[in-house]
């Protein structure tokens, strides 16, 4: 793994401007305390700052879809969040509901404890549905929980299932946005042609730069404006 200094420099080299960083940020609101007005404000911020998309729960994805369409903000909904331990049939209903409402991306939590082959079967079903809508599928792997061999198998299962991107963590149980975790996941996913989303504990511009330097293509954060504003002091 490169040194922290090298990772930081790589991140700065890849992020030429605040606009570059904004275009990589999935601005996220998944708090149980979130109100509809909170979500509306997040979508407005995503429009104002040019964030990549807004990541919401299924219920708010549906409720807010009209505003998002009006403002030109892409919506991503979590599926099976946060444990992933719902039957596939339930996840497919969730996915169908948000896709019909206009979501263009899904952040899916599979039932990881069932093992890589079960993850393959589950993600395959969700990908098949998502692709019929032209939607992007990201698979959340809770990378810090697994040894390298298991994580490699989970990444490969996601690829074989047709997912586009693997994501470090939900941010609920592990803080997967650190450069070590991102580098581990990117080292496995990038050779397979998959994108990498870093999420979990990214709250500053430095955090975002380190994640990108370690191999992240996308940054997931519930502190999107703070991250972007603090990044401006670095460039």
From Swiss-Prot:
Give the pH-dependence text from the record: Optimum pH is 6.5. Is extremely stable over a wide pH range: upon heating at 50 degrees Celsius for 60 minutes, the enzyme does not lose activity at pH 4.5-11.0.
Which domain of life does the UniProt lineage start with?
Archaea
Catalytic activity annotation? 2-deoxy-D-ribose 5-phosphate = D-glyceraldehyde 3-phosphate + acetaldehyde
| UniProt keyword annotation of Protease present | no
Keywords per UniProt = Cytoplasm, Lyase, Schiff base
Give the metabolic or biological pathway: Carbohydrate degradation; 2-deoxy-D-ribose 1-phosphate degradation; D-glyceraldehyde 3-phosphate and acetaldehyde from 2-deoxy-alpha-D-ribose 1-phosphate: step 2/2
| InterPro entries registered for this protein in UniProt | Aldolase_TIM, DeoC, DeoC/FbaB/LacD_aldolase, DeoC_typeI
According to the UniProt record, one GO cellular component term is: cytoplasm
Question: Where is this chain's protein located in or outside the cell?
Answer: Cytoplasm
The entry assigns this protein to a family as follows: Belongs to the DeoC/FbaB aldolase family. DeoC type 1 subfamily.
What is noted besides the main data?
A: The enzyme is also highly resistant to organic solvents such as ethanol, methanol, N,N-dimethylformamide, and Me(2)SO at 50 degrees Celsius. Loss of activity is not observed in the presence of these reagents even at a concentration as high as 40%.
Write the protein's name: Deoxyribose-phosphate aldolase
């Amino acid at each position: 793994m490169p040194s922290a200094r090298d990772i930081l420099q790589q991140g700065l080299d890849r992020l030429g401007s605040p606009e570059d960083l904004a275009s990589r940020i999935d601005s996220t609101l998944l708090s149980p305390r979130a109100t509809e007005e909170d979500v509306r404000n997040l979508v407005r911020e995503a429009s104002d700052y040019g964030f990549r998309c807004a990541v919401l729960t299924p219920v708010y994805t549906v409720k807010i879809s009209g505003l998002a369409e009006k403002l030109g903000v892409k919506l991503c909904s979590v599926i099976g969040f946060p444990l992933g331990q719902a039957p596939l049939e339930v996840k497919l209903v969730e996915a169908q509901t948000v896709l019909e409402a206009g979501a263009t991306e899904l952040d899916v939590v599979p039932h990881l404890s069932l093992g890589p082959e079960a993850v393959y079967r589950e993600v395959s079903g969700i990908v098949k549905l998502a692709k019929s809508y032209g939607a992007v599928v990201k698979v959340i792997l809770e990378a810090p929980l697994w040894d390298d061999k298991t994580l490699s198998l989970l990444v490969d299962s996601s690829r074989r299932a047709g997912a586009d991107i693997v994501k470090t963590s939900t941010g609920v149980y592990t803080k997967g946005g650190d450069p070590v975790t991102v580098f581990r996941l990117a080292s496995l996913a990038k050779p397979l042609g998959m994108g990498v989303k870093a999420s979990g504990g990214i709250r500053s511009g430095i955090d975002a730069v380190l994640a990108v330097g370690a191999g992240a293509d996308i940054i997931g954060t519930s502190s999107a404006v703070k991250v972007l504003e603090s990044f401006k002091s670095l460039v």
